[in-house]
Structures are given as C-alpha cells and as structure tokens.
C-alpha cells in the first residue's frame, strides 16, 4: 500500500495489470522476452517454477545420506567407475558420467579383485586396502561406455551411457566423477543438450516417478522412493558407500516442500543481456548499509540469470501471449488492443484474471483462433512494476510518473 494510504496501488486491479502487460510487450518488442526449455527450481506440490530470489528464501541446512555408486565399464571385465551424489532419486534418469579432462584419475585394485576408477585426489573415500594400478587424465577416459543402472529404452541413444568431458567437474568433494541426469540439473542439462543426450523425464511435475521408471518406484514421490533405490543398488552390488552429510538445500518458501531442479518449458526475461548495465548502475546507488552494494546485491547481479517468469498457477497476472496451432503468436499490451484483436466483441465487465481472460480468443491471420498461453507471471514482477503501474502508466498520469522517475529513495 506504500506510504500514501489514501491512494494505494493494488496489483490485482485491471489498471495495474494493464500497465504490467504494456511493460511485457515492450520487453517482447525488444526481444527481451522469450520462451525456452531449461532446468529451473520447481515445487512439485505447488506445481510451479520459482525465481532465484524465491529460492533464496527457502534454503535449509539438512542432514541426509549421500551415496557412492559404481558403474560397470562395458569392455573391461570387473572394472567400474565410481560416482557420488546427494540426490539418489536422479539415478533412474542417469544418461552419462562426466569427468574433468585435466583432472588426474587412478585405477585401483580392491581386495575382492574388482578395479575402480576415481579422482586421484579423492582416494580418501575408499575403505581398507587398495593398490594403485594405473594413473590417467580424464581426457583418456572420454568415450568409454558403461552399463546403465536401469534399462530404460527411452533413455538410450548413440550418445548415452558414455564418459563425457565437463568443465564443472572438481575434486573438492565426491569422486571427481559426476553422474549426469540431463533433466534434473542446470549443468547436466547444459552439457546434455550440447552433446545430444536424451531429454526424457523419469519424474513428473508432481515429483512422482513416471511409468518409464523401474517398476518398483513408479508412481512414488522421489524422496519416499530414495531408500528403495539405494537398497536396490545394494542388492546388485553397485552401492559402494553411504555417508551422512550436512548440506544446504532449497525448499519451497510457500509450502516447505523440497524443490526439484527440473527441466520445463517457461517464459524468460533476458536479464543476462543487461547484467553489465545493472552492475554499472548499482555503482551509482548509495546503499544503506553500504556493504549491500558489493555484497548481497552486488553478488546477485554478478551471477544474475535469465528470469523464469512463468508460474503454473490459477491466481496471478496472466501472461498476455496468445498462440495459434499454426505457430503464430501475439502479445497484448493493453485492454484496447485486446478488444481490437479479439475474435468476438467483448462486452460487459472486464476481468483480466483467469478464468475470464482465457475465454478470449484472438483472430489469427491463418483464419483460426489463437488461445492464451495459460501461464501467469511471477508476482515479483508485479512488485517490481509498482514504480509505473501504480500510476496506470503509460495510459494515464504520464506527467506524474515522469516527475517522479527515477525515484530518489527506495526502502526494501
């Protein structure tokens, strides 16, 4: 409600939404708004992605079990490569193992005769006696094939179940070998799409395993199925080690459900394209306390990613984009434009929210009708629009807005 209690702005009002729509259309015209398929923080209970600042509100230090698992190399009898993860539920989605090209690896012989490959700097994870047989770089391991933990035909192609190079592999923890589940990690997705790994989900948006997953976990929530996944690997002599750790993990700030990093279709704002400009402007701002400038806020700007704007909810400002089956799309920037482009005359009371807005179809040049993309937008975009949307700018109060903008003082 701001300080002016006699003239509050309310984000659910049509005037406010119309100003937000105008701003989104301006971004669209500048090629700053785009649709993309990426891995985003996702709440399986709320059924929607979260923005980076929403995620930052829900981190907790949790104590849980990490696991070390052996992957059997195909061409060498009794040879395995060791990988580590804190998210065993992603194992059914495994399609590759990543190594660092310049990292040093060793092949060791264990007391039972099996041979194991892991990072040289991570030998401390081994139990008991072992003998180093060979040393090599990660580059020498690239291309080796291994047997999948689970036979899921949808995840098989010419590139899957091989050792691949990746620039994010380290020996700070784990084994120097990263298990890749393309659909459940930002780095995994980036490297997976680059080399053509299968982009197939084993988990649904509700956090439950799909029917392509192994039968014993189908239809079960990921965290509830983790123990059975570990026991299954143990019975097959693939679970090498369990280890309790404390690590920071994000939970939904609304419902306290564990978040997934989940590949999904969403609309994005190209924040990365204006990152440099935002950092320059930040230097001109007087922050109180001053450490925020180069600390919390400065660090956020430095690593700012494209903003996942879509939310898969009922309540919120609707994304004003309509699309036809032929592929044509239209973004609406005002109520007047909506009336003009609607396939039927709009009469009666206008409510820009769902479900009213989804009854509006637009005329397409192909002769068919366009339907609105059903997403709503991140409520933080509504909040960030207050500077202009409270005045119903640019439809009203232009002078009032221009007199105040840019604002001299912002209290957060």
Residues of each region from the PLM?
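Residue patterns forming the tRNA-binding/recognition surfaces of aminoacyl-tRNA synthetases
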Residues: 1-92, 143, 153, 168, ...
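Short glycine-aromatic motifs
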Residues: 33, 106, 130-135, 350, ...
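Extracellular structured ligand-interaction cores
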Residues: 64-66, 105, 319, 376, ...
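Internal mixed beta-strand/loop scaffold within catalytic domains of large alpha/beta enzymes
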Residues: 78-86, 96-98, 398-407
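Short amphipathic beta-strand/extended segments with alternating polar/hydrophobic composition
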Residues: 78-86, 114-124, 133-134, 329-336, ...
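Protease-associated
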Residues: 92, 96, 103-180, 186-190
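Conserved oxyanion/phosphate-binding beta-strand-loop segments in alpha/beta enzyme cores
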Residues: 135-168, 257-280, 367-396
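Alpha-helical recognition segments enriched in aromatics with Gly/Pro capping
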Residues: 195-207, 313-315, 333-412
């Amino acid at each position: 409600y701001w300080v002016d209690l006699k003239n509050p702005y309310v984000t659910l009002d049509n005037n406010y939404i119309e100003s937000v729509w105008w701003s989104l259309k301006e971004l669209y015209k500048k090629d700053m708004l785009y649709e993309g398929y990426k891995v985003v923080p996702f709440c399986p209970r709320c059924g929607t992605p979260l923005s980076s600042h929403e995620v930052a509100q829900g981190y907790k230090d949790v104590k849980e079990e990490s696991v070390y698992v052996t992957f059997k190399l195909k061409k060498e009898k009794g040879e395995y490569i060791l990988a580590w993860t804190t998210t065993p539920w992603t194992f059914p989605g495994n399609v590759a193992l990543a190594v660092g090209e310049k990292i040093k690896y060793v092949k060791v012989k264990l007391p039972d005769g099996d041979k194991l490959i892991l990072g040289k700097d991570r030998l401390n994870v081994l139990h008991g006696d072992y003998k180093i047989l060979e040393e090599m770089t990660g580059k020498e391991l690239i291309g080796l094939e291994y047997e999948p933990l689970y036979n899921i035909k949808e995840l098989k192609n010419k590139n899957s179940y091989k050792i691949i190079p990746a620039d994010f592999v380290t020996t700070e923890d784990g084994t120097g070998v990263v298990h890749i589940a393309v659909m459940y990690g930002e780095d995994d997705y980036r490297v997976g799409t680059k080399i053509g790994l299968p982009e197939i989900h084993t988990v649904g948006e509700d956090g439950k395993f799909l029917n392509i997953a192994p039968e014993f976990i189908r239809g079960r929530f990921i965290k509830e199925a983790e123990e059975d996944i570990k026991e299954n690997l143990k019975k097959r002599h693939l679970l090498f080690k369990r280890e309790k750790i404390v690590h920071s993990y994000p939970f939904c700030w609304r419902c306290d459900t564990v978040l997934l990093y989940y590949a999904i279709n969403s609309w994005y704002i190209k924040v990365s394209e204006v990152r440099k400009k935002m950092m320059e402007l930040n230097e001109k701002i007087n922050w109180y306390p001053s450490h925020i400038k180069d600390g919390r806020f400065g660090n956020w700007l430095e690593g700012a990613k494209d903003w996942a704007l879509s939310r898969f909810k009922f309540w919120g400002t609707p994304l004003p984009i309509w699309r036809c089956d032929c592929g044509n799309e239209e973004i609406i920037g005002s109520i007047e434009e909506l009336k003009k482009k609607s396939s039927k005359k709009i009469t009666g009371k206008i409510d820009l929210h769902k479900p009213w807005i989804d009854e509006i179809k637009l005329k397409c040049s192909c002769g068919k009708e366009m339907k609105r993309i059903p997403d709503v937008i991140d409520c933080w975009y509504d909040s960030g629009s207050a500077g202009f949307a409270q005045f119903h700018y640019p439809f009203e109060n232009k002078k009032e807005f221009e007199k105040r903008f840019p604002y001299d003082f912002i209290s957060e």
